[in-house]
C-alpha cells in the first residue's frame, strides 16, 4: 500500500459499470436513474470501465473492446458527451459516492491519437513495426515508457480527469513502470487529495511469462509503493483450484492468510467472485444456497469488495465485451436483501483494523472466520459446498443471532449446526450481541 493509504478502504464496496451494457440505451444519461438503487447495495465507489473512444483498426467485434482506446482525453460519443459524463459524476457525488475510471496506460488502439501524433512513443518489434507483447491482444499496440515526454503527457491527462473523478483503476498496472505510477500519484495529489488508486495486478504466471520474455513486470509488493488496492490475482489460481477440487480448503485458506504475512500491515486487496475478464460465479454454481455462502465469504475477506454490475441478479450470463449485450436485470434470484445486510457488516471497525483468521472445518467444506478487535469478535461461518455441517466454533456456549437472517443458533460444547446457510455472529467478550 502507499504510505498514505486509508484503511477504511477495507470497509468499502466498489460497483463496476460497463456503460455500453448497463442499460439498453448504453449511455451516461441512462445510468443516472439507477444510481439510488446502486447506492442501496452499499456502493461507496462506482468504477466505470473505459469510457473513451474506441479504435477502429483491428477492432474486436462490431463495437470493439473498451480497452483499445483511441483518445485518453475524450469520451466515447456512443455514451454521450463530456458534459453528460460530468453530470453523471455530479449525480454520483450528490449521493455520497465516488467516481473511479479505468486507466489503460499499457497500450492504445493502433489508430489512436498518440499513434498519429507521437509514433516514437510506441514499442517496436524487431522488424520496426508497432506491436504488442501479448499476442492475443491484437487490437492494441504497446506504449514505450522509456520516453519522458510520454510520462508528462499521461500524468497531465490524469490530472485533467482528477478534476472530475475520485479514483483510477489502472489496467494491467504491473506492465507499466512502477516509478511512473509513484510520480503520477504524487502529482495527481496536488490537484486532488485522497484519490483512490486501484491496480489490476496480474496473475503470477502472467508476470513470470513477461519477465521470461525480457519485459518488465511488477509484483503486488512493488505496486503497493504507489497503489492503495491491488487485485487478488496473486491467489486467484488457488481459489479456482479449490473450486474445482484440485486442492483442499485448508490449502486455499492458508494462501489467503499468507497475504497477511507478506504484505504491509495496512495492505488492501480487491475481493471479488467475478469481473469482466472471468465467468459469472452463477455459471459455476447452480445451487443458490451455495452461491450465498460464497458471496458472504467474499464480503468477509479482508479488503475492498467488488460487485460487478448484474451480480446482484445472480445471472450466469457475462455480457460480451466487444458487442452490445445489455444486462438482463430480471435474473433468477434477487440478492439485493442479502447485499444490503452485508454492507452493514462491511462497515464494522473490526473489518478495518481487527486481527483476522480463517480456519477449515475438520470434516466439511466449511470456513470459520473471525475478526477480533479489542473485546469485539465478528465470526463468520460459510458452507462453501452448500451443505449443512456440525463445526467447532471458538465462541462461548450460548445462543447467537445470525446477522443475515435473524435466526438463532445454539453453540453447545463448542459445536454448532450450520443449517447450510451463511452465518455472521457479533459478540463482545463473554457477552453476546444480537443486533449490529
Where do the model's predicted regions map?
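Hydrophobic faces of well-ordered beta-strands that scaffold small-molecule active sites
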Residues: 13-15, 46-48, 99-101, 168, ...
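Active-site-proximal helices and loops of the catalytic beta/alpha 8
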Residues: 171-264, 269, 297, 316-350, ...
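Short, surface-exposed connector motifs at secondary-structure boundaries
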Residues: 162-169
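Short, solvent-exposed turn/loop segments enriched in Gly/Ser/Thr/Pro and often Arg
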Residues: 47-60, 102-111, 171-177, 200-204, ...
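Active-site clefts of carbohydrate-active enzymes
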Residues: 263-286
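Carbohydrate-interacting/catalytic domains
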Residues: 1-47, 53, 86, 90-91, ...
